[in-house]
Amino acid sequence: MKIKNFIYFLIYFIFLFKVINGQNKTCKISVLLSGDKSDLGYNYMMNEARVLAESQLHMYPFSIYYEHLEESTLEAEHAIQDSVDKGANLIVVSSVIHFSLGVKYATKYKDEPIYWIIRGSKLVPTLPKVVILNFNSFELHYLLGYYAGLATKTGVVGFVSPGIGINTLSCDNSFYIGAKYARSNITFLDIHTGSWYNPEVSYKAAQKLIENGADVIGMSQDDMSVQKAIMDSGGLGLGVTGYPGHYQFGSDVAYSYLTNWTNLFITYANHVINDDWPAFDSFFTNLSRKDAIFMDDFSFRVPIDIQTKTKIELENLMNTSYAPYKSDPILESIGLQFSGNWINDTQFRANTKILPSYGDSTVDYPESLKIGVTVVSGFCIFLCLISMIIVIKFKEAKVIKSSSPIFCLLILFGCIVIFVGCIMFARSPTDGSCRSRVWLLSLGYTIFLGNLMVKNWRIWLLFDNPKLKKRAITNWKLYPWVSGIVIIDIVILSIWQALGDIVAESRTGIDSLTKYEYRNVCASSDQGSIALYLLLVFHGLILLVACFISFKIKVVDIEEFNESKPITTSVYIITFCLFIVIPIMVSSPTVTTQTTIICICALITTMLSIILLFGTKFFKMITVGLELGQTFVTSTKSSSHSQRTKSSKSSNGSGPKINGFGGNVLNLDDDSDEISSEKEKKKPIESNPKDHMAVFTSDEETSKASKFSSEQFSREQINDNIILENNNDNEEKQKDEEEIKEEKLLVSEIQAKRLSLEQNGQTEIDSNDV
């Protein structure tokens, strides 16, 4: 019996303790506001809920609030920490821009008796003391857009929003779809302010839309500044902040949605007091629930027929299965995918693209920049096309043939791509142009420098050949190298595009613009910037290799093949401009200046390179002549020739000196009989050890020539033209002279084939131990 009484007493004591403890437990609310508490908008309604909840629950100590927290993340962090220090145990993070910050501090104090209401769109499964606050703002903007489509007299409606980086564009698109449902031929203008709360900028943004014909304007700003602009112009405003606009503006506000967060605050404050907080909860509301969001009455200035049609659409929205703002097929045009009858909710909320047929009131690049770059680039493209025609028409000319016509055409094609990229750089930025202009410039320079580098790499290999090894380096053997360089460039560009999130976005406060002016600029993520720097390193390596090859071909003693000077000059100019462009990209000056310098550098480097590489060749064709089918003569002694001469002397001992080709031409083209005069045919062919000779033939002869050995190459032709100075009857001396003559033929043939048939890429050097 005593034990039973003791148990009853214990239970009673625990109950009494809990009751007393519950009566002593209090709730202290702290509200974080993004803007001004008196903005007569979203922040006003949130602060009003705090005041009413405090009054109805007789809260003591009093609740607290912090405002203007959008201006500084540090201020927002200080506000949360200060709330904790002052004993707040229900902290309301009212703005979606502070969602991550709220989660951070909720995680930090998850073991403390502190509860959170955070505005956001997704639950946090690791934080049971956090309630996510959200409401369907898309249906509200759709309904107001529907009214706007009915009410507009100009057929033009507008929308003002913070823009990408602050919020998605789903509200903008919902307003537009609503207007389109009411009036199919609607014109939609959209403008971004870069902030939830900046009354001065918002007012001027609305004025710009009005100047472009908009007479009804929606918005997702936290204050009524946009609607003030439309009312000041004589139009009817919309209540788009949750505040009853007619309280202040009377009948000038045509239609409004209203919010009341008092019940939300009271409900969760009671959970704190009663210690029965619902873990992992969320508070999502919409028009159909009628617990926090409502539609206000129409102004008497709104025609009855418009009121009636809008009310019918409101009744349709009460059915949650009706959601045209995320089921219209036009949403597929911006890459959103349907999941059943609707767009996937996650994609819809995260969308950052505006629907087609919209306008932006922005400050564009100067027309002088656009026209100047376009005209100069167009002229340069014309010169490149003319140069390509000349190369094709006179590909048999000595100076063109020595430069590999096919690679000359590829180099000119790369230059054309660069000039097209310059034109794209001077255009108004869009998502497509932001990507394409970098692709065009990068691929253009890769094609230009890659072909130039590979073409001269072949020259280096052929002339840096002291042992006269047989080397057949055709164009088909060079194409994979060029393709490999281009593929590397494409891979880096693909990584940049995949990771960079490259988009065109509107920005304020740049290029010395006033706070009322906006400009579209290209933007990318940090990963995109890293890939872009990797691309610059890749092009820097190409320039270094090109410099190295141009240095190595300085030893080439045939003028037509030695392009070291123009290549070195071109590479120097490009490198110099690159060292100008990189600091500009890092320091980020005004966008207009940046674009201008990049275009000028690209135009100058490319045009000067064309003049250096092709202008000199065309000038020589005019002054010297085409020299069709002629061989290439040098009057300098190369290192490989010196070694061959020494080898010849050591094998011949003190034998007679070999007289060779001199400056005469050995022409193996199809038209050799027509080009060479009879006198030249009968002239003995002499060989001078100081001279080298090269010959180019047609494509057919290229394939045929490779089948013959050097001994069959021109033995009969040379034997018929050699005049022996001494004809000794002594059989032994005659035998020695025959051996010397044979040695002479071998040396001459090797020299004659020092360079071979490059028109079709066939290059062959026969190796004979002379």
Swiss-Prot record:
TM annotation in the entry: 371-391, 406-426, 443-463, 484-504, 529-549, 566-586, 595-615
A GO biological-process term: G protein-coupled receptor signaling pathway
PROSITE patterns linked: G_PROTEIN_RECEP_F3_4 (PS50259)
CDD domains reported for this sequence: 7tmC_GABA-B-like
Any one Gene Ontology molecular-function term assigned to this protein's record: G protein-coupled receptor activity
Bias (Basic and acidic residues) ranges: 676-693, 730-740
Coiled-coil stretches: 715-760
Cellular component GO terms held in the UniProt record: plasma membrane
Secretion signal, residue range per the UniProt entry: 1-22
Carbohydrate attachment residues: 24, 185, 260, 286, 319, 344
Protein location: Membrane
Membrane topology, record value: Multi-pass membrane protein
Keywords associated with the record: Coiled coil, G-protein coupled receptor, Glycoprotein, Membrane, Receptor, Signal, Transducer, Transmembrane, Transmembrane helix
Similarity section: In the N-terminal section; belongs to the BMP lipoprotein family. In the C-terminal section; belongs to the G-protein coupled receptor 3 family. GABA-B receptor subfamily.
Protein name: Metabotropic glutamate receptor-like protein F
